[in-house]
Amino acid sequence: MKSLIRKCPRCHAYTMEEKCPKCGSDTYIAVPPRYSPVDRFRKYRIEELRGEIDGENSGDQI
């Protein structure tokens, strides 16, 4: 399995380890998902960005 660069959310350090060597917190993969022009989940990502899924922008406009 190939290794991807990881980032610590607490101290913002980049590493290849599962745990941050500086502060010991869990790290996450810092590489964004691959872009595809045929994106099956595009609709849901756009709705989430606009707040329509969570009910924040449910059509009650003034």
From Swiss-Prot:
The keyword Transmembrane helix does not apply. Keywords: Ribonucleoprotein, Ribosome biogenesis, rRNA processing. One of its GO terms (cellular component) is ribonucleoprotein complex. GO terms for biological process: pseudouridine synthesis; rRNA processing. Gene3D superfamilies: H/ACA ribonucleoprotein complex, subunit Nop10. It comes from the Archaea. Pfam families: Nop10p. The keyword Protease does not apply. GO terms for molecular function: snoRNA binding. Involved in ribosome biogenesis; more specifically in 18S rRNA pseudouridylation and in cleavage of pre-rRNA. Belongs to the NOP10 family. This is Ribosome biogenesis protein Nop10. It comes from Thermoplasma acidophilum (strain ATCC 25905 / DSM 1728 / JCM 9062 / NBRC 15155 / AMRC-C165).
